[in-house]
A protein has these predicted regions:
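Short, flexible active-site-adjacent loop segments at beta-strand->alpha-helix junctions, enriched
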Residues: 27, 160-162, 183
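Conserved Radical SAM active-site core
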Residues: 40-156, 160-171
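Conserved, mostly hydrophobic/aromatic
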Residues: 21, 30, 132, 156, ...
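Residue-level detector of conserved catalytic or cofactor/ligand-binding positions
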Residues: 175-184
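N-terminal pre-triad scaffold of radical SAM enzymes
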Residues: 3-57, 74-83
Length: 184
């Protein structure tokens, strides 16, 4: 699965203390999206302009010449970026980061099981968010199955913008509902 973040000890994405697994990929472009780095399905270079110090270090270390600092701004040529990570590693302001990594469902389960004691004490569990989790429907259902086999409470944050059949595949896993409307 393509994951961009795993947030531990979350309290706003379902009941109790939860671990939120943020998945990459979303077909929507909502202007209020709180996770714009989740939109693209693949790993991507994400630049936070407000953190950029304007030092030009990123340009100096890029072996592909994909980073250019000009006119007080950083410009990226993503089509030639090799994703080596040198620019993100050297950035003193942490303005550059590669967002997204491939994780197997079993690897995600191992990660979230580290917080099992918190779930049991608080009535919490695991929330799958994004992006749009159903953009990875087949892998999502497999992950839900593995989480349920561990006896974990699950919730999926979704806009529901997928065919009913895809959504129904997840129904046997007793997923809870975590609504973004409650936070707006």
């Amino acid at each position: 699965m393509r994951v961009f973040n795993i947030e531990r000890f979350a309290t706003h994405d379902g009941d109790g203390i939860r671990t939120v697994v943020f998945l990459k990929g979303c077909p929507l472009r909502c202007p209020w999206c709180s996770n714009p780095e989740s939109r693209e399905p693949d790993r991507q270079l994400f630049h936070t302009a407000g953190k950029c110090l304007g030092c030009g270090s990123c340009q100096k270390v890029c072996p592909a010449g994909a980073v250019r600092y000009e006119g007080g701004r950083v410009h990226f040529r993503v089509e030639i970026c090799t994703e080596c990570g040198a620019c993100a590693d050297i950035c003193p302001g942490e303005a550059l980061e590669f967002v997204g990594r491939q994780m197997e469902a079993e690897e995600i389960v191992r990660e979230v099981l580290r917080d099992r004691d918190y779930y049991e004490e608080s009535g919490g569990g695991v929330t799958l968010s994004g992006g749009e989790p159903f953009a990875q429907a087949g892998e999502l259902v497999r992950l839900l199955l593995l989480l349920k086999q561990q006896g974990l409470n699950t919730a999926v944050e979704t806009a529901g913008q997928y065919p009913t059949e895809r959504l129904e595949e997840a129904f046997p896993y007793e997923i809870g509902r975590a609504s973004c409307r409650e936070r707006v």
